[in-house]
């Protein structure tokens, strides 16, 4: 299985990089994991709704350029469907069972994702109503992917 995480912006904090590297290493026995970063678009601190949409559109085009047609795509979104870890694990298992060996997760920038990215997504996934930095979301996401594989393998990691 191939897991790809497409993110907007560079990860600067060493502690986030270290956590992601650790989960990538742990996941390597189950799947090939790649993290693709696309540049974030600079925006003024105070901007209009039109400027907000322009930034999301530009970042969205960058995201979409990294996604292939055959990939099953989850887009992280506050308004996405919330799942338990067990439900998420079952979805990953079902995708693998039914021939989806390439799964992509998208984490948008600080403004979210464009309508085009959301439409390309096969599913919108939410990790709760809380707002968190998109850099932290990378760690949360990769840990939950690892947890899903551990649940599916019957490991006591998930208690």
Curated annotation (Swiss-Prot):
Alphabetical list of Gene3D superfamilies matching this protein: 3.40.1280.10
Catalytic activity: pseudouridine(1915) in 23S rRNA + S-adenosyl-L-methionine = N(3)-methylpseudouridine(1915) in 23S rRNA + S-adenosyl-L-homocysteine + H(+)
Pfam families: SPOUT_MTase
SUPFAM superfamilies reported in the protein's UniProt record: alpha/beta knot
Compartment annotation: Cytoplasm
Entry binding sites for S-adenosyl-L-methionine: 108, 127-132
One of the record's GO cellular component terms: cytoplasm
E.C. number: 2.1.1.177
Keywords of the record: Cytoplasm, Methyltransferase, rRNA processing, S-adenosyl-L-methionine, Transferase
GO MF, one annotated term: rRNA (pseudouridine-N3-)-methyltransferase activity
Superkingdom of the source species: Bacteria
Enzyme class, broadest EC rank: transferase
InterPro entries: Alpha/beta_knot_MTases, RlmH-like, tRNA_m1G_MTases_N
PANTHER family: METHYLTRANSFERASE, RIBOSOMAL RNA LARGE SUBUNIT METHYLTRANSFERASE H
Function per UniProt: Specifically methylates the pseudouridine at position 1915 (m3Psi1915) in 23S rRNA.
Assembly: Homodimer.
Annotated NCBIfam families: PRK00103.1-3 (NF000985), tRNA_RlmH_YbeA (TIGR00246)
Protein family membership: Belongs to the RNA methyltransferase RlmH family.
Name of the protein in its database record: Ribosomal RNA large subunit methyltransferase H
């Amino acid at each position: 299985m191939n897991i790809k995480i497409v993110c907007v912006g560079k990860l600067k904090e060493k502690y986030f990089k270290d956590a992601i590297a650790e989960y990538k290493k742990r996941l390597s026995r189950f799947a090939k994991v790649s993290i693709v970063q696309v540049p974030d678009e600079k925006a003024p601190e105070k901007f209009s709704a039109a400027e907000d949409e322009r930034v999301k559109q530009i970042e969205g085009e960058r995201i979409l350029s990294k996604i292939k047609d055959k990939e099953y795509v989850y887009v992280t979104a506050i308004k996405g469907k919330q799942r338990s870890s067990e439900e998420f694990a079952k979805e990953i298992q079902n995708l693998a069972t039914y021939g989806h060996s390439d799964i992509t997760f998208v984490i948008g920038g600080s403004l979210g994702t464009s309508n085009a990215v959301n439409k390309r997504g096969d599913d919108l996934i939410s990790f709760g109503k809380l707002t968190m930095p998109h850099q932290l979301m990378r760690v949360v996401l990769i840990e939950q992917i690892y947890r899903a594989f551990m649940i599916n393998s019957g490991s006591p990691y998930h208690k």
